[in-house]
Design a protein with these regions (language model features):
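Generic cytosolic/nucleocytoplasmic N-terminal low-complexity/intrinsically disordered segments
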Residues: 1-2, 68
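Bacterial Sec-dependent N-terminal signal peptides
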Residues: 3-9, 15-43
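Segments that shape or occlude catalytic/ligand-binding pockets
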Residues: 30-227
């Protein structure tokens, strides 16, 4: 057997195994026509509504009250906590939780996640970039001003599971469904709509993922689609 034929056979076997591993769960049937208030596109600010405001010392880019970037004209001797307090429009109920940092010859940054009353805000937080002298240069991310949101769910997790199963017409065993609880901001037409929501995730193939957000107070399915 030629080496090329052997290699082709091995490659074909690998591809077959990959396709098998990437197949979706046949026991899960999603209702593709489920009508929801939002889609995955509403989970990030739209670029058309980003506004930049430049002053003598910095440029702030925002979406409504949401800060997406703070860039200083020159490096400043400020801690991230000082910037959070002085530049970001968040109340005391919001906090920026340290996640990790890295400093080497090529980069110097620290990552923070946003929480509101102890509940993580979905995909919100920021990365702080410093020069090699630990002077702050810029902040990038997404910081949402969350206020007056009740973080105590009205409906239970088990009830949210029932809503999920009934709406998606799925054959889930409720004992094997797990949900996360998040503060979730949705962005639409320059406005922000913040909900306390349960999240369910289901992987589809190798790269796709279905995310379903269920309002933890009303039980409304806020969004359910493939991303």
């Amino acid at each position: 057997m030629k080496k090329s034929d052997l290699f082709s056979g091995i490659l074909a076997s690998i591809l077959l195994l990959a396709m098998t591993a990437c197949s979706s769960d046949e026991d899960v049937i999603y209702d593709q026509n489920l009508d929801c208030k939002y889609t995955w596109q509403n989970l990030d600010p739209q670029y058309d509504f980003l506004v930049s405001n430049t002053t003598d010392d910095k440029t702030i880019t925002s979406y409504g009250d949401v800060i997406t970037r703070v860039e200083f004209n020159t490096s400043v001797s400020l801690s991230p906590e000082q910037v959070f307090a002085d530049y970001l429009p968040i109340s005391e109920d919001n906090c920026m939780m340290f996640e990790n940092s890295l400093k080497n010859n090529d980069t110097n940054y620290a990552c923070y996640s946003q929480c509101y009353k102890g509940v993580r805000v979905w995909y919100c937080g920021c990365d702080c970039y410093f020069d090699q002298n630990d002077q702050l240069e810029k902040i990038e991310g997404k910081v949402v001003p969350v206020n007056n949101l009740d973080v105590n769910p009205t409906i239970s997790e088990s009830k949210a599971m029932e809503i999920l199963i009934n709406a998606l017409h799925s054959d889930y065993d409720i004992n094997y469904v797990s949900l996360g609880l998040f503060v979730v901001p949705f962005f639409a037409d320059g406005k922000i709509d913040v909900h306390l929501a349960y999240l369910h995730e289901q992987y589809e193939g190798c790269f796709g993922i279905y995310r379903t957000f269920i309002d933890a107070h009303s039980g409304e399915i806020l969004s359910c689609d493939l991303r």
